[in-house]
Structures are given as structure tokens and as C-alpha cells.
Regions:
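PLD/PLD-like phosphodiesterase catalytic module centered on the HKD motif
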Residues: 1-157, 196-338
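Amphipathic alpha-helical interface elements
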Residues: 159-160, 165-170, 174-192, 200-204, ...
Length: 338
């Protein structure tokens, strides 16, 4: 049974130093509450992740020691000590990892997928490198001063206009995507008005590595799965000519398959009534709520368990003989669990 791969986060040592210094040096007040909440959300993300740091162990431990000293030597009050100890105890801390400028296609195609790079300074070269590989580059100032990565809820009104490109405009860049919706290919109109616009909104305009796209749905007839495969790839080649896409379709025929969700390396989207919302005239055929979470950044533990269960369930009931191609290669899946 397939599982979603554990999220790996790469972090510059200078980011860690600045991140914990900012928390220590910010006077606690009513005005600081919003910043505190953002700091805590990212701290919880690091706490639950597999963290890769670009320095050796001795250098990392030296800044941990500085943090403990600030709290009068009491390790129970040092958030950095707690973080590093937890990750070390669980085998989820790696040092001497590549810097952002050193990432390459081989690394991003392996099991050691890094989805986020936390950097101390927002410089064009870092963003450019991240964009080339579909990696979300998050500078420290963005973590603490913007809401771009926070959890959002969008209310969709029946018969009102709906544009997927606008709704997903701020989605962080990615190199892998899973779309799970049993009904999104029910008709040609659903494919044209919903599936393809969603794909266009979430696939970058260019990448140095292949983009991995997995569609888990109910294909109207088994004979149509190859036709659907060819039509989706043909559309992507026209709309995103600078991106090579590895597409796979899993035909989930069971009536038990009902959950609808989209997952990328950093984004989780859930929609109560499904993603086949938009009519030909641009209006929504249902009233519903779309929940958008940047996984790992502002991710409640219960929700993470929920979406993992969605995808595991979908794979357990998929008719693998009707999957096209048959082998699952998406970076988001843990190959050791398949």
C-alpha cells in the first residue's frame, strides 16, 4: 500500500540562527501575537519534519549551546535544544547537506526529496535556483511577515464566477502533484473546465527536471484511459512547452472512493463537493468550501493524518490493471511502502 513520502526540509544554518534570535529578541506583547503565531507554526513544522542542515554537527551544536545559555542554561526552556534533540533522537536530522546552489536533478528525483529550502536572505539567485527545480524557497522575512503560506479557506458560491487560475495564484512552486477526485473526468466539460485549468495553475512554466503528475479518478470506461492519458499530455505540451511531464492515471472504480483532494510537495487542497465545479459559462455549479493548506508550514497533525489516509485508501481500491502506465513513480509516494 502506497504512502505519502515524509516531508524533508532543507535549512541554512544562518536561517536557524536568525529564526531563534528573532524569537528571543522580540518583546512579548499584544502586537507581537501574530508574529508569535507564525513563528510557532513554522517551529511546529520543523519539529515534525526531516530536517537537513547545511553545516557540520559541531557548528550546529554551537548555536544550540548559545540558545541554551540565553535561557540561563535550562535546556527545558530552549526551543532550539528541544528541536534538535527530538530530530536527533528520531533519526530525522542530517548535517553537511547540500546548499541551495548545489541541488541537482539527481537529488530531487531520489528518495531524498527536499520540498522547502529555508534561507536567511531573499536573493534572486536563490529564488531562481528553486524555481528551476520546483522547490519552494522561503526566506525568513517571508516566514514571519506574510500570510502567503498560511492556511486559507475559500467559500465558493453557487452560480458565481470561478477561476482556478485566480484561486490557486499564490500556490507555492512544486515539482510533483497528485489529483484525487473520482468525478473530475466524468465528462469532456469537466476535463476542459476543471481538470486542465487546475493542472495549468499548479504546473510551473519551466523546470530542469520532469514534473510528476498522478491522477486518481474513475475513468468512464477502461478503454478510455489511454485516450485520457494522451489528451492530458497533449494539452500540457501545448500549455507548458518547457516542462517534461511524467503522467500516470489510476482508475479508481470502487464506489467507496469518494474523498477529493490535491497534494503537491507543499500544498494540500480539499474540496467538499469535488473539483468538477466550473461550468462552461465560468460559474460554479455548487456552493462549497475549498481548504488550502501549505503542508508542514501550518499543518495540524490531525489534518496530515487525514490526507495521508485519503491517498492510501485510494490506492488500496484502485484497479491497478487499469492504471496507465502501471508503475507508480511520483516523487510524493514512498517507494518503500508500495
Amino acid at each position: 500500500m502506497s504512502e505519502i513520502r515524509e516531508q524533508r526540509i532543507s535549512c541554512e544554518l544562518d536561517f536557524l540562527k536568525m529564526f531563534f534570535e528573532k524569537f528571543r529578541n522580540t518583546p512579548r506583547s499584544f502586537e507581537s501575537l501574530k508574529t508569535d503565531q507564525k513563528w510557532l507554526a513554522l517551529y511546529e513544522c520543523l519539529y515534525e519534519s526531516h530536517l537537513c542542515v547545511d553545516c557540520d554537527t559541531s557548528l550546529l551544536f554551537s548555536i544550540v549551546k548559545d540558545d541554551v545559555i540565553h535561557y540561563n542554561g535550562d535546556v527545558s526552556n530552549s526551543p532550539l535544544f528541544k528541536l534538535i534533540k527530538r530530530l536527533s533522537d528520531k533519526g530525522k536530522l542530517e548535517t553537511n547537506q547540500p546548499r541551495l546552489s548545489e541541488i541537482d536533478a539527481e537529488q530531487l528525483s531520489s528518495e531524498d526529496l527536499t520540498s522547502i529550502y529555508l534561507v536567511a536572505n531573499d536573493v534572486p539567485e536563490k529564488q531562481s535556483t528553486g524555481n528551476s527545480f520546483g522547490v519552494y524557497v522561503l526566506p525568513i522575512e517571508s516566514c514571519l511577515e506574510t500570510d502567503d503560506y498560511s492556511k486559507k479557506t475559500k467559500r465558493i458560491q453557487k452560480n458565481k464566477g470561478l477561476e482556478w487560475s485566480k484561486l490557486l495564484k499564490k500556490a507555492p512552486i512544486t515539482n510533483s502533484l497528485i489529483i484525487m477526485d473520482r468525478y473530475i473526468v466524468t465528462s469532456e466539460e469537466d476535463i476542459k473546465n476543471n481538470l486542465l485549468p487546475i493542472i495549468d495553475a499548479l504546473i510551473p512554466n519551466s523546470l530542469k527536471i520532469p514534473f510528476h503528475l498522478t491522477l486518481m479518478t474513475k475513468v468512464p470506461t477502461t478503454d478510455n484511459i489511454e485516450v485520457l492519458y494522451d489528451s492530458i499530455l497533449s494539452h500540457i505540451k501545448e500549455s507548458k512547452p518547457n516542462v517534461e511531464v511524467n503522467l500516470e492515471i489510476h482508475n479508481c472504480t470502487s464506489g467507496d472512493f469518494h474523498d477529493r483532494a490535491i497534494l503537491s510537495t507543499n500544498l494540500y487542497i480539499a474540496c467538499g463537493s469535488g473539483f468538477n465545479l466550473r461550468r462552461c459559462d465560468g460559474s460554479s455549479q455548487h456552493g462549497t468550501t475549498i481548504k488550502i493548506s501549505h503542508v508542514g508550514i501550518c499543518q495540524e497533525a490531525g489534518e496530515k493524518i487525514e490526507w495521508n489516509a485519503y491517498f492510501k485508501n485510494a490506492f488500496s481500491i484502485a484497479n491497478r490493471r487499469a492504471s496507465y502506465p502501471c508503475k507508480t513513480n511520483n516523487r510524493l509516494f514512498d517507494s518503500n511502502q508500495q
